[in-house]
Amino acid sequence: MIFKVFYQENADEVPVREKTKTLYIEAESERDVRRKLQDRSINIEYIQPLEGAHLEYEKQSPNFQVLEISS
C-alpha cells in the first residue's frame, strides 16, 4: 500500500503548517512507515493511506514519486 506522509524537516522545532512537506512511501502498515523512516530526523505529523480514487488523484501530481526504502 502507498502512504502519504506529512512531516516537518526539523524534529526539534515547533511544527508550522507552512513548512509541512510530504512524501510518498510504500509499506505494509502505518507502523511499517514509521519503522522505515525512523533513521531520519523528521517530525511526522500524519500518515495517510492512499487507495482507489484518492491514489489516482495523487498520481496526477508532478510531485508524486514513491520513496523506496528496503525493509
From Swiss-Prot:
InterPro entries xref list: RpoY
Record's keyword terms, sorted: DNA-directed RNA polymerase, Nucleotidyltransferase, Transcription, Transferase
Enzyme Commission no: 2.7.7.6
GO molecular function, one term: DNA-directed RNA polymerase activity
GO CC terms: DNA-directed RNA polymerase complex
Catalytic activity: RNA(n) + a ribonucleoside 5'-triphosphate = RNA(n+1) + diphosphate
Origin: domain of life: Bacteria
GO biological process: DNA-templated transcription
EC class (word): transferase
Subunit structure: RNAP is composed of a core of 2 alpha, a beta and a beta' subunit. The core is associated with a delta subunit, and at least one of epsilon or omega. When a sigma factor is associated with the core the holoenzyme is formed, which can initiate transcription.
Function statement: A non-essential component of RNA polymerase (RNAP).
Family: Belongs to the RNA polymerase subunit epsilon family.
Family matches, as HAMAP family: RNApol_bact_RpoY
Name of this chain's protein: DNA-directed RNA polymerase subunit epsilon
Organism: Geobacillus thermodenitrificans (strain NG80-2)
Encoding gene (name): rpoY
